[in-house]
Amino acid sequence: ADWENGKLYEYDVRKLSKPGKNKLRYKGKVAVLIGTGTFSSANMLTNAIKDYKLATLIGEPTAEPGNDFGEIFPFMLPNTYINATTAIKMFMRANGDTGDFSGIKPDIEVRNTPEDIQNKKDRVLDRALQWIQEGR
């Protein structure tokens, strides 16, 4: 569909494909640490990892949803000349679910406490290392 000053592009999510088999792909355990600071491109990567089961996510849910809006477009309001911005893209979950606006949930949920941070202890990293070394 054409707009007055641009174009609208839509992608049919049914045409998106899952990553195929690749004999070069690493077959060992892969842990990806996530949390409330996981956002933007890192959140999109986390989304694909979760939906395609490419690795095990460890930590706490991301603060940004898998379905989110971005790609900021700046413009000036014609009558007031006020500068404004709006999002011009919706980024969708890799699984095609456009209704889920919650954060990406980890496979293994672990949270650092304020005391952990104060004592320079990383409970999330420790749990990831345990999972890799012991398989649980």
Placement of each model-derived feature along the sequence:
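Gly/Ser/Thr-rich loop/hinge elements
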Residues: 1-29, 67-76, 88-89, 99
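Soluble non-cytosolic domains of exported or imported proteins
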Residues: 24, 36-43, 115-123
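Loop/turn elements at helix/coil->beta-strand transitions in domains of secreted/extracellular proteins
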Residues: 27-29, 53-56
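Terminal peptide-recognition signature
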Residues: 30, 49, 96, 128
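Active-site-proximal beta-strand/loop segments in catalytic clefts of secreted hydrolases
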Residues: 33-37, 59-62, 86-91
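Extracytoplasmic/secreted cell-surface and envelope-processing proteins
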Residues: 39-45, 66-69
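C-terminal regions of proteins
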Residues: 66-112
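Low-complexity, Gly/Ser/Thr/Pro-rich intrinsically disordered linker/tail segments
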Residues: 100, 104-136
